[in-house]
Amino acid sequence: MTNAMKVEGYPSMEWPTSLDIPLKASEELVGIDLETDLPDDPTDLKTLLVEENSEKEHWLTIALAYCNHGKTNEGIKLIEMALDVFQNSERASLHTFLTWAHLNLAKGQSLSVETKEHELTQAELNLKDAIGFDPTWIGNMLATVELYYQRGHYDKALETSDLFVKSIHAEDHRSGRQSKPNCLFLLLRAKLLYQKKNYMASLKIFQELLVINPVLQPDPRIGIGLCFWQLKDSKMAIKSWQRALQLNPKNTSASILVLLGEFRESFTNSTNDKTFKEAFTKALSDLNNIFSENQHNPVLLTLLQTYYYFKGDYQTVLDIYHHRILKMSPMIAKIVLSESSFWCGRAHYALGDYRKSFIMFQESLKKNEDNLLAKLGLGQTQIKNNLLEESIITFENLYKTNESLQELNYILGMLYAGKAFDAKTAKNTSAKEQSNLNEKALKYLERYLKLTLATKNQLVISRAYLVISQLYELQNQYKTSLDYLSKALEEMEFIKKEIPLEVLNNLACYHFINGDFIKADDLFKQAKAKVSDKDESVNITLEYNIARTNEKNDCEKSESIYSQVTSLHPAYIAARIRNLYLKFAQSKIEDSDMSTEMNKLLDLNKSDLEIRSFYGWYLKNSKERKNNEKSTTHNKETLVKYNSHDAYALISLANLYVTIARDGKKSRNPKEQEKSKHSYLKAIQLYQKVLQVDPFNIFAAQGLAIIFAESKRLGPALEILRKVRDSLDNEDVQLNLAHCYLEMREYGKAIENYELVLKKFDNEKTRPHILNLLGRAWYARAIKERSVNFYQKALENAKTALDLFVKESSKSKFIHSVKFNIALLHFQIAETLRRSNPKFRTVQQIKDSLEGLKEGLELFRELNDLKEFNMIPKEELEQRIQLGETTMKSALERSLNEQEEFEKEQSAKIDEARKILEENELKEQGWMKQEEEARRLKLEKQAEEYRKLQDEAQKLIQEREAMAISEHNVKDDSDLSDKDNEYDEEKPRQKRKRSTKTKNSGESKRRKAAKKTLSDSDEDDDDVVKKPSHNKGKKSQLSNEFIEDSDEEEAQMSGSEQNKNDDNDENNDNDDNDGLF
């Protein structure tokens, strides 16, 4: 009888289930059933085995049966008794057995460290004895490698394994045997490579094992699956384990691994809650079934920890670890212990015990330093323990190898954002360091957004949008802030989350800053609707914000709100400032009253920098000249007494120095020129001081850009202005950009910027000045490219600017300047047309320029009559008028006559060319018709010829078919001749006769014989009934002997001889009576 593990489709592995022991005194046999008859104490068998002098194999078979039934200690005891019976070399295999038995015991999960070490020591001692008897036996070699493996000496095990395999191959080579791979050595090598984390090499060996021995135990499919799992191919891993379980349903390792795969699939591949519930429920059910049979398996216990954690039973998670897993930790793989410790860390974290959580995460990393989740947990506990710098270091080290991890980018972004927002950190760090913190936070959070959106099936955490918006606000990039805050709003609306009041308020603020007052007002009102009447402070703030948005469109309403707010809360400084500002801006308050109010406000709040800044602005913009000096004094006092870093005071003083520098620059006095340079330097120093305090202060940055531009350093000025535009896209910034482009002679870009200002910022006050600047840009471009059209564009803009000043006083210097420009443009257009080639001008253009010249002369006369006009000397103006009335006018009239004659000539030439072209077209059409007709006739002729050829070919085919039929009939008659028997009798004679003929005379007969043979074979295939022929004297066929002989001779003949004898062969055919025709 045999015990077999049957695997469908493969041969079975079998162990003996019974043993027959012969009795020494008789020929009888004593049978032992190895399944049921094994005694609990192996000494009961010793008497029988010793008295009957049983062979060593009987002892080993019984011991092996004990081991197969889980009684390894009894098997060891039996073999130890056998050592007393056998001596010398017979003990070799016994020691080998004991080695493997002790190695097997050392793998037990419930052993202590001391017990495991004892078993390994016993295995080592027995292995030494076994090697002493037989060092080259493969069983001893494998045991040596296995011993190294269990002690964790993987490098030594690999090295030893390679040496043993080489020695075996060398022995095979010496013996003349073919070396074959040893499955057990391959299995050990695959396991060692896996432990060394060389998963690809390990996978290849496991696959090789599967090919060599598909029923090998342990199943290579489990190793294949483990390698695939480590190589991030979970689908192939699960398939491998499922196949192993299918072949052996009792394989515990395979069933546990399949269960792990089910848990993973339920979390990663569930498309909705329903599928997750079904998959997770099935996994839990399978866990329950497997755990009932393997309650001490550490992997299953760790899975139970996972289940209880998600259930919220954190104490049970900790109990499983401390009371069950920790007891057998020496026998558990480190990766399993690491996972179990990790869940303990999470449980402590959930219970709020962050110190113990930190310890458990550290313990998890000690067991497996690659445990990513444990590293994340460690960093989070550091945050909870207020170790922010340490947590950043932890996460940054983790980021080096996990850049694409969404959660890691989110955490790092939030940590750096927290440092950027922290007021204490801001005070103790420089502006550059603060900017670096901001940039790092944005880098990580924007990468988090990119990674999350790329998945297309995950929602972004709305807080990420909020923080990014806030970070861009610190950089004064309000448009970008608005974009991200709007995305946060969309996200909240999508998940139907109640929108916080703060989000609506901030959105409104960003819309206000970007100039969309209507949208801002609407959002402020939405926010106010969410506030209860009891929350008075929030209500007042929103009322103030609503008033700010209505200042442009409804000043009365804004003033009313400010008055209400200040009456209820007199200490609301911002409302009082805005109220006074509106009154002053609309001239609703007398200067003396305004001065009194401002002084009262300042006296009550002398140290308030907002009020001091407003007071400085008032002094600067009041009509009294004395206030300019007061403004300077006031700003200096602010810097000296109250705050040396006040941005408004510093910028105001810097602006003053710029004004002084400009005035000195106009003077021709060298001292004034030197004073101008010093003033510019002082202004630069003040602007730079502001930027040190606030790196994103756009007013200081624009001041620096203006100084660079006025110093002809246009490149740096342009770069700064572009950055300022990104933060504050207002009219001044765009105009300054246009000025720089104009100075750099990039007229196209300058024109584009001026036109953008006109479209985007519809400011009636500045529109005429911008139109004049736009005309100037077109004029500069026209001079460069010598284009009349560009002069016309410049003229159109200048005229539009002049029309907008109809209501202004005629004494305005700006109007005089524009009129002069218009007159000058008319003269310039006339001069350009006069000098241009007739090909590039028209009669109408010259006529228009004559009219324009008249208009220009009128404007010059008008300006000449004005006493206050002093742009150019009167004498020069009179010379221009005289030049226009005489030389210019007569030159234009001549140009007009020349142009008319030129255009008449051109018109005549065009008409003549058109006629010639039409005639050529008609001729060409005639040629084309002729060619088309010739082509058609040719095609018809070809078609007719083709048809005739087809008819002739058809006739030839029919004739050939008729000839073939007649030839076939003749062949049938010759084959059925009555002379067949006579011909058969003469075969030997003819053969001898023909062999004596010359080669020339036999050549034709060989060819004819070959032809006849073909016809004979055809007849055999047709299988027709032969009829007697009436053609006497002819034979129906040639003999096979003749054909064979003639074939041999034909192969020896040369091609030249064959060609020479063709005619002779034909004559011989007629003479010979051989049946050929």
From Swiss-Prot:
Note: Present with 12900 molecules/cell in log phase SD medium.
Pfam families: TPR_8
Subunit structure: Component of the PAF1 complex which consists of at least CDC73, CTR9, LEO1, PAF1 and RTF1. Interacts with SPT6. Interacts with FACT subunits POB3 and SPT16.
Chief location: nucleus
UniProt TPR repeat ranges: 56-89, 138-174, 183-216, 218-251, 298-332, 338-371, 373-405, 421-455, 462-495, 501-534, 540-572, 664-697, 699-731, 732-764, 768-801, 830-863
Positions carrying Phosphoserine: 1015, 1017
Function: The PAF1 complex is a multifunctional complex. Involved in transcription initiation via genetic interactions with TATA-binding proteins. Involved in elongation. It regulates 3'-end formation of snR47 by modulating the recruitment or stable association of NRD1 and NAB3 with RNA polymerase II. Also has a role in transcription-coupled histone modification. Required for activation of RAD6 ubiquitin conjugate and the BRE1 ubiquitin ligase which ubiquitinate 'Lys-126' histone H2B.
Organism this protein belongs to: Saccharomyces cerevisiae (strain ATCC 204508 / S288c) (Baker's yeast)
Entry GO terms, CC: Cdc73/Paf1 complex; euchromatin; nucleus
SMART domains for this protein: TPR (SM00028)
GO molecular function (one): RNA polymerase II-specific DNA-binding transcription factor binding
One GO term (biological process): regulation of transcription by RNA polymerase II
Keyword line: Activator, DNA-binding, Nucleus, Phosphoprotein, Repeat, TPR repeat, Transcription, Transcription regulation
Record's subcellular location: Nucleus, Nucleoplasm
Location of the region described as Disordered in the Swiss-Prot/TrEMBL record: 959-1077
Basic and acidic residues: bias regions: 959-980
Residue stretches of biased makeup (Acidic residues): 1042-1051, 1063-1077
Protein name, as recorded: RNA polymerase-associated protein CTR9
